[in-house]
């Protein structure tokens, strides 16, 4: 496992508070071992899509970033697309969601969930 000192990706304080809220919420059985995993899949209108899940499994080659007791987990393949990025949480009229501020994205779709490099 790697830490955030080697891999420059940030989890904002607000996003960390939201992860903590979700993992402590009764709906998901108060599993404090859950971590926010962000990963990339092919698809979407721009070629790649961001996905987020709460996960309790960690691989030995995953990158782990900590903020206020909350862990963000990224697999090595996804990390190459997210390097230097910021994971945040957005709340607005159209809903709320985790978002990626990705300096590697050349183009993004209007909803912000897909990108190209």
UniProtKB/Swiss-Prot annotation:
Its cofactor is iron-sulfur cluster. GO terms for cellular component: cytosol. Pfam families: Fe-S_biosyn. One of its GO terms (molecular function) is 2 iron, 2 sulfur cluster binding. It comes from the Bacteria. Keywords: Iron, Iron-sulfur, Metal-binding. The keyword Repeat does not apply. One of its GO terms (biological process) is iron-sulfur cluster assembly. Signal peptide: none annotated. Binds 1 iron-sulfur cluster per subunit. Iron-sulfur cluster binds at residues 45, 109, 111. The keyword Iron-sulfur applies. Belongs to the HesB/IscA family. Homodimer. Required for insertion of 4Fe-4S clusters for at least IspG. This is Iron-sulfur cluster insertion protein ErpA. It comes from Blochmanniella pennsylvanica (strain BPEN). The lineage of its organism: Bacteria, Pseudomonadati, Pseudomonadota, Gammaproteobacteria, Enterobacterales.
